[in-house]
Regions:
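Transmembrane beta-barrel domains of Gram-negative outer membranes and organellar outer membranes
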Residues: 19-241
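Cleavable N-terminal export/targeting peptides
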Residues: 1-25
Length: 241
């Protein structure tokens, strides 16, 4: 299903980090603190009209060493299309390593690589090939609780009628209080199939800190693809310990 190809690319953008990343598609270079876990119970997807492609599952992140984060995303996939009804099954397993290779505290600037493997484990949209995303992410923190982060990378997308493509995003967040952060982002992705079109997404997001360990995260907005307007969304409960 072409829509599921697009959803997988969307979820690959939505990586995991304590200070940005979720709920945004755009990631940041901040890894999980060494010896700590960040776990996200999430639901994410996109659609248009009565068509919906969504994943629900766990994002598991561990701070393996200073500047290094190990990530595994384990989803269940759901899809609905007119005349076909609902389908569900295991999603594509994702494995990634984030490596922060630059950090300047005084300037508030950092950068990281976050290569990601997307394994062909989905039950209702089986693939024969493993995909790989090769992104770079950077961030600038300002006084007053404002952060600007973004970057992008190249998706190696083998398979019949598939195309490799570039994708990029930029986001800005503002700490409104100690427990509330708001943000906005724009992302762009090239065509992932022969004869397909590029995709642009805009979104608003928020993070509500419930306690020292738990937070609620939300984002969503319009998606422009295939000469029509759809929508995308992300919601999660995060646990950091």
């Amino acid at each position: 299903m072409k829509h599921l190809h697009r959803l997988a690319a969307l979820l690959a953008l939505a990586a995991t980090s304590a200070f940005a990343g979720p709920p945004y598609l755009t990631d940041d270079p901040v890894p999980t603190d060494t010896g700590h876990w960040e776990i996200y119970a999430f639901a994410a997807g996109e659609g248009h009209g009565s068509t919906l492609d969504a994943d629900a599952g766990l994002d598991l992140n561990y701070g393996a060493s200073p500047g290094v984060q190990l990530t595994a995303t384990v989803p269940l996939s759901f899809a609905h299309e007119p005349h076909q009804g609902w389908q569900s099954g295991t999603g594509d397993l994702e494995l990634a390593v984030k490596y922060r290779f630059f950090e300047e505290h005084e300037l508030g600037i950092s950068a990281a690589a976050f290569p990601r493997l997307i394994l062909p484990t989905a039950a209702h949209a089986p693939r024969e090939h493993t995909r790989m995303l090769l992104p770079l992410w950077a961030e600038k923190d300002f006084s007053g609780g404002t952060s600007l982060f973004g970057g992008g990378g190249y998706m190696i997308n083998p398979g019949r009628e598939n195309r490799d493509f570039w994708q990029a995003g930029v986001a800005v967040t503002q700490d409104v209080s100690k427990r509330l952060s708001l943000g906005a982002e724009v992302t762009r992705q090239g065509s992932d199939t022969d004869g397909g079109t590029a995709q642009t997404r805009a979104g608003l997001g928020s993070s509500v800190q419930l306690s020292d360990h738990y937070a609620l995260l939300f984002s969503g907005g319009p998606t422009w693809a295939d000469h029509r307007t759809g929508y995308h969304f992300y919601a999660a409960l995060s646990l950091v310990y």
